[in-house]
Amino acid sequence: MRVLWVALVVTLLAGCRTEDEPGPPPEVHVWWEESKWQGSQPWEQALGRFWDYLRWVQSLSDQVQEELLSTKVTQELTELIEESMKEVKAYREELEAQLGPVTQETQARLSKELQAAQARVGADMEDVRNRLVLYRSEVHNMLGQTTEELRSRLASHLRNVRKRLVRDTEDLQKRLAVYQAGLREGAERSVSALRERLGPLVEQGRLRAATLSTRAGQPLRERAEAWGQKLRGRLEEMGSRTRDRLDEMRDELEEVRTKVEEQGSQLRLQAEAFQARLKGWFEPLVEDMRRQWAGLVERMQSAVSISSSTSAPSDNQ
């Protein structure tokens, strides 16, 4: 269970009765005040979580007291302290980064004071945690004995620590607010002074630029026109060369086409002559083969006729 040690502190400060001295329920006295560190800055919100953490423990029941000897409480408090100090340090570094408009001596003094205030707040929170650790050890050693005196001493010390922590936290908050206001005022003065110094220079620069523009406008236009004419002449020259080259390429292509047509005609004539020669070679062979084939067919027909005549008398017998 979270933050059980702080619950024990709350129970003690509430004046819980001991086992040996029963009596009416005492009035609960909260040793911390309502969370007042609910500002817009992250470090103020971190301190607010620390106070809310303690106030939440007050709502725990008495059944958790037997579990309060765990070290979980000190771990939780350590995390809250580290978170608070981290946020305070980040905000302090942010303010130091904004100390540009002030002198180096003032910047060093402000940084030193902020570090001292931060250290005091951190020491107060560490004191609360250390007192809880010490009380845990003493309670562990005094189990079965009366702890009324120990509770009274712890409650008194925690009240003193609470007052000191509240005072140091308020001091840190006031210092940060004063330094932030001073930084804003210094930055505004620096910006105003810079604007006053740069105003005449900007006006002079504007007038000089306008004068130079007026003086340089005419030569620039003349140079631009001359350059444009030169560019047009070069483009026309390149266009003429391109047209001449295209005409030459067209003539060369026409000449190549004529040569190709002549070579095609020659190839057709050569092919026709070769075809005629082949025809002259193969026609006698084809005619000879036709005569031989006709003779062969005629002999076969004669043989078939003779065979038919011979087989007919045999059938009659």
Swiss-Prot record:
<keyword id="KW-0345">HDL</keyword>
<dbReference type="InterPro" id="IPR050163">
    <property type="entry name" value="Apolipoprotein_A1/A4/E"/>
</dbReference>
<dbReference type="GO" id="GO:0005615">
    <property type="term" value="C:extracellular space"/>
</dbReference>
<dbReference type="GO" id="GO:0120020">
    <property type="term" value="F:cholesterol transfer activity"/>
</dbReference>
<dbReference type="GO" id="GO:0043395">
    <property type="term" value="F:heparan sulfate proteoglycan binding"/>
</dbReference>
<dbReference type="GO" id="GO:0031012">
    <property type="term" value="C:extracellular matrix"/>
</dbReference>
<keyword id="KW-0967">Endosome</keyword>
<dbReference type="GO" id="GO:0034380">
    <property type="term" value="P:high-density lipoprotein particle assembly"/>
</dbReference>
<keyword id="KW-0446">Lipid-binding</keyword>
<dbReference type="GO" id="GO:0060228">
    <property type="term" value="F:phosphatidylcholine-sterol O-acyltransferase activator activity"/>
</dbReference>
<dbReference type="GO" id="GO:0042158">
    <property type="term" value="P:lipoprotein biosynthetic process"/>
</dbReference>
<dbReference type="GO" id="GO:1903561">
    <property type="term" value="C:extracellular vesicle"/>
</dbReference>
<dbReference type="GO" id="GO:0008203">
    <property type="term" value="P:cholesterol metabolic process"/>
</dbReference>
<keyword id="KW-0964">Secreted</keyword>
<feature type="repeat" description="7">
    <location>
        <begin position="211"/>
        <end position="232"/>
    </location>
</feature>
<feature type="repeat" description="4">
    <location>
        <begin position="145"/>
        <end position="166"/>
    </location>
</feature>
<dbReference type="GO" id="GO:1905907">
    <property type="term" value="P:negative regulation of amyloid fibril formation"/>
</dbReference>
<feature type="repeat" description="5">
    <location>
        <begin position="167"/>
        <end position="188"/>
    </location>
</feature>
<dbReference type="Pfam" id="PF01442">
    <property type="entry name" value="Apolipoprotein"/>
</dbReference>
<dbReference type="GO" id="GO:0034382">
    <property type="term" value="P:chylomicron remnant clearance"/>
</dbReference>
<dbReference type="GO" id="GO:0034364">
    <property type="term" value="C:high-density lipoprotein particle"/>
</dbReference>
<dbReference type="GO" id="GO:1900223">
    <property type="term" value="P:positive regulation of amyloid-beta clearance"/>
</dbReference>
<feature type="modified residue" description="Methionine sulfoxide">
    <location>
        <position position="142"/>
    </location>
</feature>
<dbReference type="GO" id="GO:0033344">
    <property type="term" value="P:cholesterol efflux"/>
</dbReference>
<feature type="region of interest" description="Homooligomerization">
    <location>
        <begin position="265"/>
        <end position="317"/>
    </location>
</feature>
<dbReference type="GO" id="GO:0034362">
    <property type="term" value="C:low-density lipoprotein particle"/>
</dbReference>
<dbReference type="GO" id="GO:0070062">
    <property type="term" value="C:extracellular exosome"/>
</dbReference>
<dbReference type="GO" id="GO:0033700">
    <property type="term" value="P:phospholipid efflux"/>
</dbReference>
<keyword id="KW-0162">Chylomicron</keyword>
<keyword id="KW-0677">Repeat</keyword>
<feature type="repeat" description="2">
    <location>
        <begin position="101"/>
        <end position="122"/>
    </location>
</feature>
<dbReference type="GO" id="GO:0071830">
    <property type="term" value="P:triglyceride-rich lipoprotein particle clearance"/>
</dbReference>
<dbReference type="InterPro" id="IPR000074">
    <property type="entry name" value="ApoA_E"/>
</dbReference>
<dbReference type="GO" id="GO:0008201">
    <property type="term" value="F:heparin binding"/>
</dbReference>
<dbReference type="GO" id="GO:0032438">
    <property type="term" value="P:melanosome organization"/>
</dbReference>
<dbReference type="GO" id="GO:0001540">
    <property type="term" value="F:amyloid-beta binding"/>
</dbReference>
<feature type="repeat" description="3">
    <location>
        <begin position="123"/>
        <end position="144"/>
    </location>
</feature>
<feature type="region of interest" description="Specificity for association with VLDL">
    <location>
        <begin position="277"/>
        <end position="289"/>
    </location>
</feature>
<feature type="region of interest" description="8 X 22 AA approximate tandem repeats">
    <location>
        <begin position="79"/>
        <end position="254"/>
    </location>
</feature>
<feature type="binding site">
    <location>
        <begin position="228"/>
        <end position="235"/>
    </location>
    <ligand>
        <name>heparin</name>
    </ligand>
</feature>
<comment type="function">
    <text>APOE is an apolipoprotein, a protein associating with lipid particles, that mainly functions in lipoprotein-mediated lipid transport between organs via the plasma and interstitial fluids. APOE is a core component of plasma lipoproteins and is involved in their production, conversion and clearance. Apolipoproteins are amphipathic molecules that interact both with lipids of the lipoprotein particle core and the aqueous environment of the plasma.</text>
</comment>
<dbReference type="GO" id="GO:0055090">
    <property type="term" value="P:acylglycerol homeostasis"/>
</dbReference>
